[in-house]
Amino acid sequence: MLERLRGGLVASCQPVDNGPMDRPDIVAAMAQATVAGGATGLRIEGVANLRATRPLVDVPIIGIVKRDLGDSPVRITGTVADARALIEAGADIVAYDATSCPRTDGREDILAAILDGGAIAMADCATEADAREALSAGAAVIGTTLSGYTAETATDDDGPDFALLRRFRSLGGFVMAEGRFNTPDLAAEAMRAGADAVTVGSALTRLEIMTDWFAEAVRSAR
């Protein structure tokens, strides 16, 4: 499964929450369009979106559930129940928050549920320590997804964390570059820095965000 992703682009099809494109049928269409454009894998949020997409594509799907847990900053597949539901819906790979942030269901329990369900586990990490712990516990994929999004790693830099990506390369495991790789040049640089694959989201599937980038550039040029 991971060999099918190696050297390729993963399209994260996650429309803006509650926006006009936030519907399972539209997410599935986005997924088909990105595969037609050359994506070798998909990252799909939500069980309903995953169920709508799975029958329409034959590329590997990374499934996640995003939800606010209230008593925890963890938002990505933060419960055992969510991990199991994603596997039942057809996820080949389940990504989960592998940081040390407090949560009700321990990250070890979530990882165990993914592996027990027969899926591949992807650890969404913020630090090298997160990745090391995830790999030792059985995760096959380590992603730079959460660098810059935790209290420990918060930064004003709006670019990707290439330093972390390079450190991941030395750890073993399948390295997924993810998080602010929003131009073709940055995606290519990620591969040169040692990524096995690159995930791109907002620049491909969040039209409101992309439109705002262009609109702001035009306004500021007046």
Q: What are the functions of these language-model segments?
A:
Residues 38, 57-61, 89-93, 115-119, ...:
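Glycine-enriched alpha-helix->loop->beta-strand junction motifs that scaffold or abut catalytic
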Residues 82, 107-116, 126-146, 154-173:
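Short loop-to-alpha-helix "cap/lid" segments that border enzyme active sites
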Residues 16-21, 161-222:
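Alpha/beta catalytic cores of nucleotide-metabolism and tRNA/nucleoside-modifying enzymes
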Residues 14-16, 65-69, 89-103, 141-154, ...:
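Glycine-rich phosphate-binding active-site loops on the catalytic face of alpha/beta enzymes
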Residues 22-26, 74-81, 106, 156-163, ...:
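Alpha-helix N-cap and loop-to-helix initiation/capping positions
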Residues 1-84, 88, 129-136, 181, ...:
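Conserved N-terminal beta1-alpha1 strand-loop-helix module at the mouth
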